[in-house]
Amino acid sequence: MKHSNRTRSIDLRPLGAGLLALALALPGVANAQEKDSFRIAWSIYVGWMPWSYGDSAGIVDKWADRYDIEIDVVQINDYIESLNLYTAGEFDGVTVTNMDALAIPAASGVDTTLPIIGDFSNGNDGVVLKGTDDLMDIKGQRVNLVELSVSHYLLARALESVDMTERDVTVVSTSDADIVGAFSSEGVTAAATWNPQLSELRSMPNASVVFDSSDIPGEIIDTLALNTEVLEANPDLGKALTGAWYEIMARMSSDDEVGIDARTRMAEAAGTDLSGYESQLASTQMFYDAADAVDFVTSDQPEDTMENVRQFAFERGLLGATASSPDFVGIEFADGSVLGSEDNVKLRFTSEYMEMAAEEAL
Protein backbone atom coordinates (compact mmCIF):
# COMPACT_ATOMS: atom_id res chain seq x y z
CA MET A 1 0.00 0.00 0.00
CA LYS A 2 1.29 3.41 -0.95
CA HIS A 3 1.92 5.59 2.07
CA SER A 4 0.07 8.85 2.45
CA ASN A 5 1.91 12.07 1.66
CA ARG A 6 0.12 13.91 4.46
CA THR A 7 3.46 14.46 6.21
CA ARG A 8 2.18 17.57 7.97
CA SER A 9 5.33 18.72 9.74
CA ILE A 10 8.14 21.20 9.39
CA ASP A 11 10.58 23.07 11.60
CA LEU A 12 9.66 26.68 10.88
CA ARG A 13 12.14 28.32 13.22
CA PRO A 14 14.71 29.00 10.46
CA LEU A 15 12.12 29.19 7.67
CA GLY A 16 9.32 31.51 8.73
CA ALA A 17 11.10 34.83 8.21
CA GLY A 18 12.35 33.82 4.76
CA LEU A 19 8.90 32.69 3.67
CA LEU A 20 7.39 35.90 4.98
CA ALA A 21 9.84 38.05 3.05
CA LEU A 22 9.29 36.04 -0.12
CA ALA A 23 5.53 36.06 0.27
CA LEU A 24 5.39 39.83 0.71
CA ALA A 25 7.65 40.35 -2.30
CA LEU A 26 5.49 38.37 -4.70
CA PRO A 27 2.63 39.91 -6.65
CA GLY A 28 -0.68 38.19 -6.06
CA VAL A 29 -0.04 37.77 -2.34
CA ALA A 30 0.14 41.36 -1.18
CA ASN A 31 -2.38 43.72 -2.77
CA ALA A 32 -4.27 40.93 -4.54
CA GLN A 33 -6.21 42.03 -7.62
CA GLU A 34 -9.30 40.71 -9.33
CA LYS A 35 -8.34 37.99 -11.81
CA ASP A 36 -9.86 35.06 -13.68
CA SER A 37 -7.28 32.27 -13.35
CA PHE A 38 -6.36 30.46 -10.13
CA ARG A 39 -4.18 27.59 -8.93
CA ILE A 40 -5.04 25.24 -6.06
CA ALA A 41 -2.51 22.75 -4.63
CA TRP A 42 -3.52 19.46 -3.04
CA SER A 43 -1.69 16.39 -1.74
CA ILE A 44 -2.67 12.80 -1.13
CA TYR A 45 -4.76 12.14 1.96
CA VAL A 46 -8.10 10.42 2.42
CA GLY A 47 -10.00 13.66 2.99
CA TRP A 48 -8.41 15.46 0.06
CA MET A 49 -8.82 12.79 -2.62
CA PRO A 50 -12.16 14.37 -3.62
CA TRP A 51 -10.15 17.14 -5.30
CA SER A 52 -8.44 14.56 -7.50
CA TYR A 53 -11.79 13.13 -8.51
CA GLY A 54 -13.39 16.54 -8.96
CA ASP A 55 -10.58 17.55 -11.28
CA SER A 56 -10.57 14.37 -13.40
CA ALA A 57 -14.38 14.14 -13.54
CA GLY A 58 -14.70 17.72 -14.77
CA ILE A 59 -16.65 18.93 -11.75
CA VAL A 60 -14.17 21.68 -10.86
CA ASP A 61 -14.13 22.89 -14.47
CA LYS A 62 -17.93 22.88 -14.57
CA TRP A 63 -18.18 25.15 -11.53
CA ALA A 64 -15.32 27.35 -12.71
CA ASP A 65 -17.14 27.83 -16.02
CA ARG A 66 -20.28 28.81 -14.12
CA TYR A 67 -18.40 31.79 -12.67
CA ASP A 68 -16.39 32.46 -15.84
CA ILE A 69 -13.04 31.69 -14.24
CA GLU A 70 -10.33 29.04 -14.61
CA ILE A 71 -9.20 26.84 -11.72
CA ASP A 72 -6.12 24.65 -12.09
CA VAL A 73 -6.10 21.89 -9.45
CA VAL A 74 -2.51 20.67 -9.05
CA GLN A 75 -1.29 17.63 -7.14
CA ILE A 76 1.93 18.25 -5.20
CA ASN A 77 3.63 15.02 -4.18
CA ASP A 78 5.00 16.43 -0.93
CA TYR A 79 2.51 17.96 1.50
CA ILE A 80 4.94 20.38 3.14
CA GLU A 81 6.18 21.52 -0.25
CA SER A 82 2.59 22.35 -1.21
CA LEU A 83 2.29 24.55 1.88
CA ASN A 84 5.60 26.25 1.17
CA LEU A 85 4.56 26.95 -2.43
CA TYR A 86 1.25 28.38 -1.25
CA THR A 87 2.97 30.50 1.39
CA ALA A 88 5.38 31.80 -1.25
CA GLY A 89 2.45 32.89 -3.43
CA GLU A 90 2.72 30.30 -6.19
CA PHE A 91 -0.76 28.96 -5.42
CA ASP A 92 -3.97 30.71 -4.42
CA GLY A 93 -5.11 27.85 -2.20
CA VAL A 94 -3.97 24.59 -0.65
CA THR A 95 -5.31 21.60 1.26
CA VAL A 96 -4.07 21.83 4.84
CA THR A 97 -4.76 20.83 8.43
CA ASN A 98 -5.77 23.47 10.94
CA MET A 99 -2.49 23.13 12.82
CA ASP A 100 -0.33 23.57 9.74
CA ALA A 101 -2.47 26.45 8.47
CA LEU A 102 -1.51 28.27 11.66
CA ALA A 103 2.11 27.15 11.85
CA ILE A 104 3.12 27.67 8.22
CA PRO A 105 1.29 30.34 6.16
CA ALA A 106 -0.34 32.24 9.04
CA ALA A 107 2.83 32.28 11.15
CA SER A 108 4.75 33.42 8.06
CA GLY A 109 2.45 36.41 7.61
CA VAL A 110 0.17 35.12 4.85
CA ASP A 111 -3.44 35.94 5.73
CA THR A 112 -5.33 32.68 5.17
CA THR A 113 -9.05 31.85 5.15
CA LEU A 114 -10.61 28.39 5.50
CA PRO A 115 -13.80 28.47 3.37
CA ILE A 116 -14.24 24.68 3.33
CA ILE A 117 -14.03 22.44 6.39
CA GLY A 118 -13.92 19.01 4.78
CA ASP A 119 -13.54 16.64 7.71
CA PHE A 120 -11.83 15.90 10.96
CA SER A 121 -9.76 12.87 11.89
CA ASN A 122 -11.86 10.47 13.95
CA GLY A 123 -9.40 7.62 14.42
CA ASN A 124 -7.06 8.22 11.48
CA ASP A 125 -4.26 9.27 13.86
CA GLY A 126 -3.16 7.16 16.81
CA VAL A 127 -0.61 6.23 19.48
CA VAL A 128 0.44 2.57 19.39
CA LEU A 129 2.20 0.54 22.10
CA LYS A 130 3.59 -2.99 22.06
CA GLY A 131 2.79 -5.47 24.79
CA THR A 132 0.10 -3.39 26.50
CA ASP A 133 -3.22 -1.75 25.82
CA ASP A 134 -2.84 0.79 28.64
CA LEU A 135 -1.70 4.32 27.77
CA MET A 136 -0.25 4.69 31.28
CA ASP A 137 2.48 2.23 30.28
CA ILE A 138 3.94 4.79 27.87
CA LYS A 139 5.82 6.42 30.75
CA GLY A 140 9.57 6.16 30.25
CA GLN A 141 9.29 4.86 26.70
CA ARG A 142 10.85 6.17 23.50
CA VAL A 143 8.08 7.22 21.11
CA ASN A 144 8.79 7.25 17.38
CA LEU A 145 6.88 9.90 15.41
CA VAL A 146 7.21 12.70 12.88
CA GLU A 147 8.40 15.51 15.11
CA LEU A 148 6.38 18.76 15.12
CA SER A 149 3.56 17.06 13.21
CA VAL A 150 -0.03 16.33 14.15
CA SER A 151 1.26 13.01 15.50
CA HIS A 152 3.40 15.01 17.91
CA TYR A 153 0.33 17.06 18.83
CA LEU A 154 -1.68 13.87 19.33
CA LEU A 155 1.00 12.47 21.65
CA ALA A 156 0.94 15.69 23.70
CA ARG A 157 -2.84 15.45 24.04
CA ALA A 158 -2.61 11.74 24.93
CA LEU A 159 -0.08 12.42 27.68
CA GLU A 160 -2.19 15.28 28.99
CA SER A 161 -5.17 12.91 29.29
CA VAL A 162 -3.25 10.79 31.82
CA ASP A 163 -1.57 13.67 33.66
CA MET A 164 1.79 13.24 31.96
CA THR A 165 3.92 15.54 29.82
CA GLU A 166 6.59 15.01 27.17
CA ARG A 167 9.12 14.94 30.00
CA ASP A 168 7.73 11.50 30.83
CA VAL A 169 8.73 10.08 27.43
CA THR A 170 11.48 10.50 24.84
CA VAL A 171 10.40 11.62 21.38
CA VAL A 172 12.34 9.93 18.57
CA SER A 173 12.06 11.83 15.29
CA THR A 174 11.08 9.36 12.56
CA SER A 175 9.86 10.10 9.04
CA ASP A 176 6.45 8.86 7.96
CA ALA A 177 8.18 6.72 5.33
CA ASP A 178 10.24 4.96 8.03
CA ILE A 179 7.70 4.62 10.83
CA VAL A 180 6.37 1.18 9.81
CA GLY A 181 9.85 -0.29 9.44
CA ALA A 182 10.96 1.23 12.73
CA PHE A 183 7.99 -0.12 14.68
CA SER A 184 8.52 -3.60 13.26
CA SER A 185 11.98 -3.72 14.83
CA GLU A 186 12.37 -5.32 18.26
CA GLY A 187 13.75 -2.24 20.00
CA VAL A 188 10.86 0.10 19.13
CA THR A 189 7.88 -0.20 21.45
CA ALA A 190 5.89 3.01 20.97
CA ALA A 191 4.89 5.16 18.02
CA ALA A 192 2.39 7.78 16.90
CA THR A 193 1.30 8.04 13.27
CA TRP A 194 -1.64 8.35 10.88
CA ASN A 195 -3.33 6.15 8.32
CA PRO A 196 -2.45 4.18 6.30
CA GLN A 197 0.67 3.62 8.41
CA LEU A 198 -1.45 3.40 11.56
CA SER A 199 -3.40 0.44 10.18
CA GLU A 200 -0.14 -1.36 9.47
CA LEU A 201 1.19 -0.75 12.98
CA ARG A 202 -1.98 -1.88 14.72
CA SER A 203 -1.94 -5.14 12.76
CA MET A 204 1.50 -6.10 14.09
CA PRO A 205 1.79 -8.76 16.83
CA ASN A 206 1.17 -7.49 20.39
CA ALA A 207 0.41 -3.96 19.17
CA SER A 208 -2.48 -1.90 20.52
CA VAL A 209 -3.78 1.57 19.73
CA VAL A 210 -3.98 3.19 23.18
CA PHE A 211 -5.11 6.66 22.08
CA ASP A 212 -6.39 8.00 18.80
CA SER A 213 -7.96 11.07 17.30
CA SER A 214 -11.45 9.82 18.14
CA ASP A 215 -10.46 10.62 21.75
CA ILE A 216 -10.06 14.28 20.73
CA PRO A 217 -12.78 14.61 18.08
CA GLY A 218 -12.72 17.76 16.03
CA GLU A 219 -9.13 18.72 16.85
CA ILE A 220 -7.31 17.49 13.72
CA ILE A 221 -9.25 19.28 10.99
CA ASP A 222 -8.68 18.96 7.24
CA THR A 223 -9.51 22.04 5.20
CA LEU A 224 -9.14 23.93 1.97
CA ALA A 225 -7.31 27.20 2.61
CA LEU A 226 -7.34 30.25 0.34
CA ASN A 227 -5.25 33.40 0.44
CA THR A 228 -7.55 35.90 2.14
CA GLU A 229 -6.67 38.83 -0.11
CA VAL A 230 -7.17 36.73 -3.23
CA LEU A 231 -10.52 35.47 -1.93
CA GLU A 232 -11.76 38.92 -0.95
CA ALA A 233 -10.85 40.29 -4.38
CA ASN A 234 -12.34 37.25 -6.12
CA PRO A 235 -15.28 35.81 -4.15
CA ASP A 236 -16.36 33.79 -7.19
CA LEU A 237 -13.32 31.58 -6.53
CA GLY A 238 -14.76 30.62 -3.15
CA LYS A 239 -18.19 30.04 -4.66
CA ALA A 240 -16.89 27.84 -7.48
CA LEU A 241 -14.70 25.71 -5.23
CA THR A 242 -17.42 25.28 -2.63
CA GLY A 243 -20.01 24.39 -5.25
CA ALA A 244 -17.67 21.84 -6.77
CA TRP A 245 -16.81 20.38 -3.36
CA TYR A 246 -20.39 19.66 -2.36
CA GLU A 247 -21.25 18.20 -5.75
CA ILE A 248 -18.31 15.83 -5.21
CA MET A 249 -19.52 15.10 -1.67
CA ALA A 250 -22.98 14.19 -2.98
CA ARG A 251 -21.49 11.78 -5.48
CA MET A 252 -18.96 10.05 -3.24
CA SER A 253 -21.36 9.60 -0.32
CA SER A 254 -23.97 7.77 -2.39
CA ASP A 255 -24.26 3.97 -2.47
CA ASP A 256 -25.14 3.76 -6.15
CA GLU A 257 -22.82 3.10 -9.08
CA VAL A 258 -21.86 6.77 -9.26
CA GLY A 259 -20.72 6.75 -5.63
CA ILE A 260 -18.81 3.50 -5.97
CA ASP A 261 -17.10 4.78 -9.11
CA ALA A 262 -16.15 8.05 -7.40
CA ARG A 263 -14.66 6.31 -4.35
CA THR A 264 -12.89 3.77 -6.56
CA ARG A 265 -11.25 6.52 -8.58
CA MET A 266 -10.21 8.31 -5.40
CA ALA A 267 -8.74 5.06 -4.06
CA GLU A 268 -6.76 4.47 -7.24
CA ALA A 269 -5.40 8.02 -7.20
CA ALA A 270 -4.33 7.45 -3.58
CA GLY A 271 -2.51 4.23 -4.46
CA THR A 272 -4.90 1.85 -2.71
CA ASP A 273 -8.08 -0.07 -3.52
CA LEU A 274 -11.72 0.65 -2.73
CA SER A 275 -11.66 -1.43 0.45
CA GLY A 276 -8.53 0.31 1.69
CA TYR A 277 -9.90 3.75 0.95
CA GLU A 278 -13.24 3.03 2.59
CA SER A 279 -11.48 1.76 5.71
CA GLN A 280 -9.75 5.13 5.96
CA LEU A 281 -13.03 6.95 5.37
CA ALA A 282 -14.48 4.97 8.29
CA SER A 283 -12.11 6.77 10.67
CA THR A 284 -12.66 10.16 9.05
CA GLN A 285 -15.61 12.35 10.00
CA MET A 286 -16.45 13.69 6.56
CA PHE A 287 -18.84 16.62 6.33
CA TYR A 288 -20.74 15.41 3.28
CA ASP A 289 -23.56 17.86 4.02
CA ALA A 290 -22.73 21.57 3.98
CA ALA A 291 -25.16 22.21 6.84
CA ASP A 292 -23.16 19.85 9.07
CA ALA A 293 -19.95 21.69 8.24
CA VAL A 294 -21.65 24.99 9.07
CA ASP A 295 -22.83 23.60 12.41
CA PHE A 296 -19.28 22.51 13.20
CA VAL A 297 -17.50 25.73 12.23
CA THR A 298 -20.04 27.92 14.07
CA SER A 299 -19.80 25.84 17.26
CA ASP A 300 -17.34 26.38 20.12
CA GLN A 301 -15.21 23.48 18.84
CA PRO A 302 -12.86 25.42 16.51
CA GLU A 303 -11.97 27.98 19.18
CA ASP A 304 -11.46 25.30 21.85
CA THR A 305 -9.29 23.33 19.43
CA MET A 306 -7.20 26.27 18.28
CA GLU A 307 -6.46 27.22 21.89
CA ASN A 308 -4.77 23.84 22.30
CA VAL A 309 -3.12 24.03 18.88
CA ARG A 310 -1.67 27.51 19.34
CA GLN A 311 -0.24 26.62 22.76
CA PHE A 312 1.41 23.55 21.24
CA ALA A 313 2.75 25.58 18.30
CA PHE A 314 4.13 28.38 20.47
CA GLU A 315 5.82 26.07 22.97
CA ARG A 316 7.72 24.41 20.10
CA GLY A 317 8.72 27.57 18.28
CA LEU A 318 6.36 27.05 15.36
CA LEU A 319 5.02 30.61 15.48
CA GLY A 320 8.46 32.01 14.69
CA ALA A 321 11.38 33.47 16.60
CA THR A 322 9.65 36.83 17.12
CA ALA A 323 6.56 35.36 18.76
CA SER A 324 6.62 36.28 22.45
CA SER A 325 3.36 34.49 23.28
CA PRO A 326 0.67 32.32 21.67
CA ASP A 327 -1.23 35.57 21.02
CA PHE A 328 1.27 36.57 18.31
CA VAL A 329 -0.97 35.30 15.49
CA GLY A 330 -4.63 36.26 15.65
CA ILE A 331 -7.19 33.59 14.75
CA GLU A 332 -10.66 34.75 13.70
CA PHE A 333 -13.71 32.50 14.01
CA ALA A 334 -16.99 32.35 12.14
CA ASP A 335 -18.76 34.65 14.62
CA GLY A 336 -16.07 37.33 14.22
CA SER A 337 -14.42 36.71 17.58
CA VAL A 338 -10.62 36.66 17.65
CA LEU A 339 -8.23 34.49 19.64
CA GLY A 340 -4.88 36.25 20.01
CA SER A 341 -3.81 39.52 18.43
CA GLU A 342 -6.62 41.48 16.76
CA ASP A 343 -3.90 43.52 15.03
CA ASN A 344 -2.29 40.46 13.45
CA VAL A 345 -5.16 38.21 12.36
CA LYS A 346 -3.70 35.75 9.86
CA LEU A 347 -5.98 32.70 10.10
CA ARG A 348 -9.74 32.90 9.56
CA PHE A 349 -12.49 30.33 9.97
CA THR A 350 -15.62 31.23 8.02
CA SER A 351 -19.04 29.73 7.38
CA GLU A 352 -19.90 32.10 4.52
CA TYR A 353 -19.39 29.83 1.53
CA MET A 354 -20.59 26.65 3.20
CA GLU A 355 -23.77 28.49 4.21
CA MET A 356 -24.30 29.38 0.54
CA ALA A 357 -23.97 25.70 -0.34
CA ALA A 358 -26.37 24.68 2.42
CA GLU A 359 -28.91 27.22 1.18
CA GLU A 360 -28.37 26.19 -2.47
CA ALA A 361 -27.35 29.77 -3.19
CA LEU A 362 -24.26 29.03 -5.28
Protein language model regions, located:
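Signal peptide processing junction and immediate N-terminal pro/mature segment
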Residues: 28-32
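Conserved C-terminal helix/tail region of periplasmic/extracytoplasmic solute-binding proteins
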Residues: 309-362
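Short, glycine-/small- and polar/acidic-enriched structural segments
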Residues: 33-173, 182-185, 189-195, 218
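Soluble non-cytosolic domains of exported or imported proteins
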Residues: 77-80, 145-153, 177, 192, ...
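Bacterial N-terminal signal peptides that target proteins for export
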Residues: 2-17
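Pocket-lining segment of extracytoplasmic ligand-binding domains
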Residues: 177-274
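Bacterial N-terminal signal peptides
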Residues: 16-27
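Secondary-structure end/capping motifs
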Residues: 233-322
